[in-house]
């Protein structure tokens, strides 16, 4: 590499020390935030490569600047691998984030002010699915659908009825905190019944879809978006897929020159590396283990009457737990667990009664611990440590026991092998 670690440390000790502290934190913490993962050294090498120097507005073979022959090869590799993974005819690998991907998808499908249906944030949706504080809620007339108040599952009869009443131009499916299988074919049936387009945001489950462990939305959605991190285990970024050539042209124009300038070709290269990793048979084993570990943790909570798992369990990489019988709110739980080096996030639950800054629940994800090598036994242990912490929040001796147990686990499963 052009600039090695010793040069970096000597040139900017303050920044070096901050990065070193973050590396230490990640090594010594159990990471359960469902949107986080652990990338390979190859992904980091690509993202830190000399490609960061190159400006390349446009698309392969159609650039505004010269000297782009090499980055054309890089971006084409990423595109072709993404298409192969998801069985899509067209892929745009340039979005800087999942939110950018969603923005471009909306621009390709609807006009400002159009009516759109998206999943309610408290029910498991995402900010970009119509939250009032998001560009999506401010640009389009979003109306939220929720889950059944009893089962906490998607109620397709209710969604159909709502769609027939409000006649949306677009229905958005996908979630950031829904632990069950999503039937995308039913969403397409509803969209067709009311003359709407269907967009799916599969950011959280993309790795499971890639491994064939969750039904794919690509055959049903007019446009599918995703992040490239989370369960895909790639760099932070976005990806857009479609099987419609005309929509592909609109997507490309929406990304550039619509909402972005030059693509981050070093990140595109990192996406290409991670896509190659996804195509390796070992990735399917990883994804299967993610689900096993998620279920193993959920089962521990299901056996404790002081906790309630939203929708009764999990079929993917995450689940939500109502913690209000044990601690005041999700924020309190998050902070308590931070103190014992277990990292997760507070999370609203369906029909939430507390503010989003407090919440009734926490969200637990298995992607990152699985990437480190945790199995079902270790995952059950993690769940037990969470319960032990929350039930003994004022007992420093018990909390110290938890910290020691966390250290044993993180030492046994290093973030990266030397």
From Swiss-Prot:
Gene Ontology annotations for the cellular component aspect, listed alphabetically: cytoplasm; cytosol
Positions carrying N6-(pyridoxal phosphate)lysine: 230
Catalysed reactions listed for this entry: (6R)-5,10-methylene-5,6,7,8-tetrahydrofolate + glycine + H2O = (6S)-5,6,7,8-tetrahydrofolate + L-serine
Metabolic or biological pathway: One-carbon metabolism; tetrahydrofolate interconversion; Amino-acid biosynthesis; glycine biosynthesis; glycine from L-serine: step 1/1
Binding-site residues, (6S)-5,6,7,8-tetrahydrofolate: 121, 125-127, 246, 355-357
UniProt keyword annotation of Repressor present: no
KW Phosphoprotein (keyword) present: no
Gene Ontology process terms (BP): glycine biosynthetic process from serine; tetrahydrofolate interconversion; tetrahydrofolate metabolic process
Keywords recorded for this protein, A-Z: Amino-acid biosynthesis, Cytoplasm, One-carbon metabolism, Pyridoxal phosphate, Transferase
PROSITE patterns: SHMT
Protein origin, superkingdom: Bacteria
GO MF term (any one): pyridoxal phosphate binding
Record-annotated site: Plays an important role in substrate specificity: 229
EC number assigned by the record: 2.1.2.1
EC top class, as a word: transferase
Cofactor: pyridoxal 5'-phosphate
Disulfide bond sites: none
Localization in the cell: Cytoplasm
Subunit structure: Homodimer.
Record-stated family: Belongs to the SHMT family.
Physiological role: Catalyzes the reversible interconversion of serine and glycine with tetrahydrofolate (THF) serving as the one-carbon carrier. This reaction serves as the major source of one-carbon groups required for the biosynthesis of purines, thymidylate, methionine, and other important biomolecules. Also exhibits THF-independent aldolase activity toward beta-hydroxyamino acids, producing glycine and aldehydes, via a retro-aldol mechanism.
Name of the protein described by the UniProt record: Serine hydroxymethyltransferase
